[in-house]
Amino acid sequence: MREHLEVISAIGLGLGLAMAFVPGAAAQSSPVTAIDIALEPDATMIDHAKAANERLLQSFPKGFSLDETHHPHISMLQQFVRTDDLDKVFAAANAVLANEKPTTWTLKAFKYYYIPAAPMGVAGIVIEPTPDLHRLQDELIKAVEPYTVKTGTPAAFFSEDGGRDIQGQLISYVENFVRDAAGKRFNPHVTIGVATEKFLKEMLAQPFPSFTFSPAGASVYQLGSFGTARKELKALTP
């Protein structure tokens, strides 16, 4: 069970390792989109995340860079929604963000962590959970719930490979996000990349100078392979 949860958590971080693919992208009766409502970190967090990402790439050049196709972000909610209702989803999320005003918050990053998928691991910068973050997530869940559907197919995700790069575990993760990654299980973080477990253990053993930052905005993304924020659907105005 623990190993299963670790693999599922790795998908949530933004990059899974060694997972089964779902063949083909079967059509659904009504188009569905897999979305990630995310906070965009400010320059302070982005600089820290990119610096850490560069360290990981020096150790493991086959990893991924934080760039236009791997946006540094803090996932608040991942769901399947009806594509025809996307504008309603954007409006509902915007209303919540306008009320909460997350760009006025100060958040604290306090450690690295990684999810093992031996011999590799997916690393992130962990953000201290706050009542504000929990409240925002709760409100987003309520606001988007009328437009959600239980599950989706690979066609719901951004793919340049006809859906063949979409993992079955990823579909399950998005389907069960509220149960498995919200509330007491919410672990706010910014993914920084992938490296060997040996390197990550050494990295985590070093002191982590905590720092503060603020959200600079928010967006709705279409999820891609391994849960990456691949395509911005709407920039929100918190």
Name these PLM-found stretches.
Residues 123:
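Short aromatic-glycine-enriched beta-strand elements
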Residues 120:
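Conserved active-site/ligand-binding neighborhood in enzyme cores
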Residues 25-117, 130-219, 223-238:
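Basic, often amphipathic N-terminal segments
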Residues 8-20:
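Bacterial N-terminal signal peptides
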Residues 1-4:
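N-terminal secretory signal peptides that target proteins for export/translocation
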